[in-house]
């Protein structure tokens, strides 16, 4: 059965609501996908503090909390997929807070995957390149730094990422990336100084 829960994941009281829903009746969670998140393409000093705080709350705090609350209800063979970003691998001006929040998701997911090995539960960070979603409408819709996006050469469809993510999760990977451009850019961050890849 499906039971929808409308939650504001930037509000900590939502975690209590979610935890209560898990205990109200016997439940087993075979798959958890943490896909909520947002970014802003603008300088830190030009972004309202409340926006950046909400970004960290949603992109980091909510991912950690939902994982921690859900894990006790996951059977052996269960899977957690946390949506990170190719931005997790390098500092990127004008999306600094977003990129740093996704670096948290990447690091947290990889470490948690190792922790849960004995339970038989997998954790994978999906690190997509630019993807054609409503994310960009919110990120640039109020005069943000659209050129941050325009300078990149590829834009992928969500269906492509889902297929790749599901395949990689079944293979037990802790990180999933789709497309040559994403893997190439990530490779550069391991070889070149940050000053050259930013």
Which sequence ranges carry the predicted segments?
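The beta1-alpha1 cofactor-binding region of Rossmann-like NAD(H)/NADP(H)-dependent oxidoreductases
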Residues: 6-17, 49
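Conserved NAD(P)H cofactor-binding loop of Rossmann-fold oxidoreductase domains
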Residues: 35-40
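Active-site loop-to-helix junction immediately N-terminal to the catalytic Tyr of the SDR YXXXK motif
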Residues: 47, 91-99, 111
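SDR active-site lid
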Residues: 118-182
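Substrate-binding pocket helix/loop in short-chain dehydrogenase/reductase
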Residues: 43-45, 51-56
